[in-house]
């Protein structure tokens, strides 16, 4: 990757330094925010290479990266570690402050059917992007109704509903209030003209206190 050389010891050292400080990786040394969504899928925050090695020993075969930043140190190290360990790395970028477009939702559904399990799915904090994807996994792969799947977006996983990241919760709540009473499945709603990500986000209003926490203190992506 441009700017990061993982082929030499010195290059990896420099990449680790960038990862440690620029990606706030020091906060994740002893905290993985790991939770099994099912016996075949675990959600976590951004894993260190040595943590990926530990996960492989536990049977993980696929690593799903939900972050962007493909030129970042975290990505260089994750790619290096997965190649070294023989893990399949899959990139599926999703955001924490936007209503996912139809193609993202349906793409997630298809992703969960084609990957090899057991799998690990992560974003940076393991709270928001991992949360919405866990909701979609629980609904599409496990067959849970949206009401139950929504448990994956909660403070238990450090997700803060009252901030800008609450737009994720709001998206599912709109389905439950607007479409479910009409008998529409979640997929039918997403594929209908009523599913308008721009309008849904415009209708959403973030709470001031939650916004201060997620934007100012936690500095979520």
Predicted segment positions?
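Substrate/cofactor-recognition hotspot
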Residues: 126
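Active-site adenylate/phosphate-handling loop in enzymes that bind or generate adenylated species
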Residues: 129
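Short cysteine clusters
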Residues: 123
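Cys-dependent protein tyrosine phosphatase-like superfamily
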Residues: 1-119, 132-221
């Amino acid at each position: 990757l441009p700017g990061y050389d993982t082929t030499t010891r010195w290059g990896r050292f420099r990449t680790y330094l960038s990862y440690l400080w620029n990606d706030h990786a020091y906060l994740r040394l002893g905290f993985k925010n790991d939770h099994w969504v099912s016996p075949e899928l675990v959600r976590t925050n951004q894993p260190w290479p040595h943590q990926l090695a530990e996960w492989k020993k536990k049977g993980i075969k696929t690593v799903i990266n939900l972050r962007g930043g493909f030129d970042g140190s975290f990505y260089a190290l994750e790619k290096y570690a997965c190649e070294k360990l023989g893990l399949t790395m899959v990139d599926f970028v999703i955001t924490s402050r936007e209503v996912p477009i139809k193609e993202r939702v349906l793409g997630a559904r298809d992703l969960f059917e084609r990957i090899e399990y057991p799998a690990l799915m992560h974003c940076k904090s393991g709270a928001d992007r991992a949360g919405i994807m866990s909701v979609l996994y629980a609904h599409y792969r496990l067959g849970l109704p949206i009401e139950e799947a929504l448990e994956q977006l909660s403070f238990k996983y450090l997700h803060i509903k009252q901030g800008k990241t609450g737009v994720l919760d709001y998206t599912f709540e709109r389905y439950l209030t607007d479409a479910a009473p009409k008998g529409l499945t979640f997929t039918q709603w997403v594929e209908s003209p009523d599913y308008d990500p721009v309008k849904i986000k415009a209708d959403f209003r973030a709470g001031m206190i939650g916004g201060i926490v997620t934007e100012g203190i936690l500095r979520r992506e």
